[in-house]
Amino acid sequence: MSEGESQTVLSSGSDPKVESSSSAPGLTSVSPPVTSTTSAASPEEEEESEDESEILEESPCGRWQKRREEVNQRNVPGIDSAYLAMDTEEGVEVVWNEVQFSERKNYKLQEEKVRAVFDNLIQLEHLNIVKFHKYWADIKENKARVIFITEYMSSGSLKQFLKKTKKNHKTMNEKAWKRWCTQILSALSYLHSCDPPIIHGNLTCDTIFIQHNGLIKIGSVAPDTINNHVKTCREEQKNLHFFAPEYGEVTNVTTAVDIYSFGMCALEMAVLEIQGNGESSYVPQEAISSAIQLLEDPLQREFIQKCLQSEPARRPTARELLFHPALFEVPSLKLLAAHCIVGHQHMIPENALEEITKNMDTSAVLAEIPAGPGREPVQTLYSQSPALELDKFLEDVRNGIYPLTAFGLPRPQQPQQEEVTSPVVPPSVKTPTPEPAEVETRKVVLMQCNIESVEEGVKHHLTLLLKLEDKLNRHLSCDLMPNENIPELAAELVQLGFISEADQSRLTSLLEETLNKFNFARNSTLNSAAVTVSS
């Protein structure tokens, strides 16, 4: 088993104080121009800036540093305060969220449930969901709080973007609307496929963020576990029309509440704003009905009406909505190829595209569609697909702007809720038992497995990419025999210190699933060509 380790370094993104003048794909730029005139800061402003960057507190591990500056971009039920913080290892800004429990005993009663919920949230790995990094409890003599670190979204909310669009007398681009809806539904489908399902419960245009490249991220997943047992008093929601009618009427809500909220977001994205009663933020049902009637596309109107049905059981699931005619398009070969490249990027050299295209004859024919008698065939030249455009498209696919929804969506890898108390490891029959390595305690947040045939019927080659919770990547590879004992292989990885014991069963399941896929694909192949399968 060979290993390559690399520490992933993330860029800090755009400066939160400067607003990008770029717009989402398919939309006219609506951001105000940035003037080049600058003036010297006054001593009072400099002092205020220094106060905001002052470090108030550190995490127990020393990695996260809380600043004085509060984050006002989110309105999350159950969260008492949110501050800007610094990730000292990655060099990026994050959000330091605090949940205050009224009494220490209240936290103790809920401790196990709180930990289980946050363990699930940290495992979430989706390009369209704001990332949860870490959490810990701070328990004092007479009070307790839970602190958790989330990704910082320096870009504005979707609500802000829609307001700017309306102010500049622009209209919503249909392609952008479809792209945004697809990204949001992809994230909701991922959350709802957890076991048990994770209900967002706070989906509004204020809690959906849009980046300068058109990437959508939903944030503010506030679990009911902290909503119902904290010091925070719930104030009247300013966006009541986003909440399903059954809120407050039933004890246990379902994922259908997120579908209702999504429908309201989709409507607001389409019409830019749903008019309320004058100064009041309350939006009556009549205003919602009027906004729906403004929609010219009957498919779009039906799509939104399905989401806003008063009976929860009649609302479609996020997965079903992805296949609604208003959204669904058969993916192009270009998109399928891009997802294939991105899915195997750990096996492709960084400069592969540049090497392939630098000696290419741009006047050569890339593809040709034959035509009938008397008609010229339709040709596509290499010059019509410049390398820079391909690079940009691959980057957009990698970032999650074009999720592939026509096939099975990625499912969350469920964490092991209870610690494994028995450290018994079956002995390996392939090699002598090695000396015990240093025990790995970090969790694996993402597993990718690839199997390809090397010698037909004799052996295969396994490549495994593991992303640990501290952003460390492990790239492992080995030869795999047709009759390989997968549980023993996973146990050997634990013994060698490559994965934690808590991740052993998850890895075993992934390896067995990928091997079954590989065997099925190989048996279905009519010739002896090499077969490659990834999971």
Curated annotation (Swiss-Prot):
Domain Protein kinase span(s) in chain numbering: 68-327
Keywords: Acetylation, Cell projection, Cytoplasm, Membrane, Phosphoprotein
Paired cysteines (S-S): none
An example Gene Ontology molecular-function term: protein homodimerization activity
Low complexity: compositionally biased ranges: 27-42, 414-432
Pfam families (alphabetical): Pkinase
Compositional bias (Polar residues): 1-26
InterPro entries with a match to the protein in the record: Kinase-like_dom_sf (IPR011009), Prot_kinase_dom (IPR000719), WNK_Ser-Thr_kinase (IPR050588)
CDD domains noted in UniProt: PK_NRBP1
UniProt GO BP: DNA damage response; endoplasmic reticulum to Golgi vesicle-mediated transport
Domain description: The protein kinase domain is predicted to be catalytically inactive.
Name listed for the protein in its UniProt record: Nuclear receptor-binding protein
The species this protein was found in: Homo sapiens
Taxonomy of the source species: Eukaryota, Metazoa, Chordata, Craniata, Vertebrata
